[in-house]
Amino acid sequence: MQVTAPRTVLLLLSAALALTETWAGSHSMKYFYTAVSRPGRGEPRFISVGYVDDTQFVWFDSDAASPREEPRAPWIEQEGPEYWDRETQISKTNAQTYRESLRNLRGYYNQSEAGSHIIQRMYGCDMGPDGRLLRGYEQYAYDGKDYIALNQDLSSWTAADTAAQITQRKWEAARWAEQLRAYLEGTCVEWLRRYLENGKETLQRADPPKTHVTHHPISDHEATLRCWALGFYPAEITLTWQRDGEDQTQDTELVETRPAGDRTFQKWAAVVVPSGEEQRYTCHVQHEGLPKPLTLRWEPSSQSTIPIVGIVAGLAVLAVVVIGAVVAAVMCRRKSSGGKGGSYSQAASSDSAQGSDVSLTA
């Protein structure tokens, strides 16, 4: 797959993080699949990435010299050879099936063989504080557009167009939603609990944000106040600005949460204020790593470039870390849902973290 520019990577990864953030006390496990055809340059490329909460833990790339499911987090390395053999077999089977699906969907849309096309899948589960399924996901996209998705009732589908309706009919005939529901309510949650226990020092930690407010003059009459939150984990955080105690939500510029490249996250929120009225504005920060919410004001004597330097350094690290490893995964969230097709064959045992995963063809 072609390497994406750093700015694009950041935008795509931000979109993915918006997906992985869940309710307080809950956790998630999601897999992102991407298959890209490349006429004249060999077989389509297939990439699979797994996440627990905001942490990537497995990776598979069909273009590797010896394609294998690979660990991407220290706590997953304790899994035995059977685990890696099983997950590798699932990914290899999916790679072949998604290649067939690309050919079939090209026919559905009456497209020529000359162009490159992409199928993306995101599926997984959110687990609530009680250890049960909170929400399940099964979404597909084709060429960057919604294709088909499992509804929240986990028993019906939403097809984006007439081509996707063909897939929907096949899946309904195969009772695919029932199998998915069993996986989401059972195997997915069970593996998520296991991963959370094995990686609890990393996955269940709560690093509080380092916070600061900076001041940036716009003119003689206005200035921007920017509230920074750096170095926090997990990714879920709330930044709000108030003027004399009243929320300024509509007037706040808020960026998506961004990875810092060191397994922590960054975010900022900004407001434009009249010069001389800066002290009427307060930034409020809520995060599970804080014993109580923070309230900050701009302190003229403490103006510092440290937060800006921290952001720049973090983004530089991020560009190096994720360009090769995350692009394929996060693109799936950006497109939201999409497409493959309908027949299925068992690829591995139900003990697989990816599920009693099936190979789907259009």
Swiss-Prot record:
It is found in: Membrane. Keywords: Disulfide bond, Glycoprotein, Immunity, Membrane, MHC I, Phosphoprotein, Signal, Transmembrane, Transmembrane helix. Residues 25-114 are annotated as: Alpha-1. Residues 207-298 are annotated as: Alpha-3. The chain crosses the membrane at residues 309-332. The keyword Transmembrane helix applies. Coiled coil: none annotated. It is a single-pass type I membrane protein. Residues 299-308 are annotated as: Connecting peptide. Residues 209-295 form the Ig-like C1-type domain. Residues 333-362 are cytoplasmic. Residues 1-24 form the signal peptide. Residues 25-308 are extracellular. Residues 343-362 have a biased composition (Low complexity). InterPro entries: Ig-like_dom, Ig-like_dom_sf, Ig-like_fold, Ig/MHC_CS, Ig_C1-set, MHC_class-I_related, MHC_I-like_Ag-recog, MHC_I-like_Ag-recog_sf. GO terms for molecular function: peptide antigen binding; signaling receptor binding. Glycans are attached at N110. GO terms for cellular component: early endosome membrane; ER to Golgi transport vesicle membrane; external side of plasma membrane; extracellular space; lumenal side of endoplasmic reticulum membrane; MHC class I protein complex; phagocytic vesicle membrane; recycling endosome membrane. Disulfide bonds join C125-C188, C227-C283. Residues 115-206 are annotated as: Alpha-2. The modification Phosphoserine is found at S343, S345, S349, S350, S352, S356, S359. The modification Phosphotyrosine is found at Y344. Belongs to the MHC class I family. Involved in the presentation of foreign antigens to the immune system. This is Patr class I histocompatibility antigen, A-5 alpha chain. It comes from Pan troglodytes (Chimpanzee).
